[in-house]
Amino acid sequence: MPFTFSHPAIVLPLTFLPRQWFSLTGLVIGSLTPDFEYFLRMRIKSNYSHTIDGLFWFDLPLGLLLAFIFHNIVRDSLFDNLPTILKSRFSAFRQFDWNGHFKRNWLVVTISILIGAASHIFWDSFTHDHGYFVQTIPALQNSVDFLGRQIPMLKILQHGSTLLGGLVIVFAIYKLPTNKNENENVNLQYWAILAGLTLTI
């Protein structure tokens, strides 16, 4: 599968639409949620989150939960401890009133999460063994000879699209306006604790 955190790249073009038509939080978190079944199971197995039914009863409620956790618990401390090159670009989002925004735009947020999750499933359908397009497009079931090894086309698409998606996200972040007044302090203890929790999990 493509790397989970490359998935938001596919929804970024939607940010060129009028601002009131979409929720960036909803699109980005929605594009990530289908892979959270892997994290919850602690193994690469998904019975629900990559299905049409799962969009509504797994991805949508989980996406809403993650959005509230991120904006109310994670966001400010994370942004405060980012390296300056990132902090200076994300500082504008620190004062965002998510709870108020959601009350006024709950339908837009909901639809954005569903669109984000659907985009994830669409992308994976080209790169999973049992993906819809892998099963219906014979060329995706072929292999390519590389240095004497047979590499499946879907693996090439997996890694190639992951790299391309990552580059798109890096470029999008680079193009964000910067705040030159951000201090350069980084709390190493914060990152040590975060790394410890990640390794523990």
Predicted regions, residues:
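N-terminal membrane-targeting hydrophobic helices
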Residues: 1-201
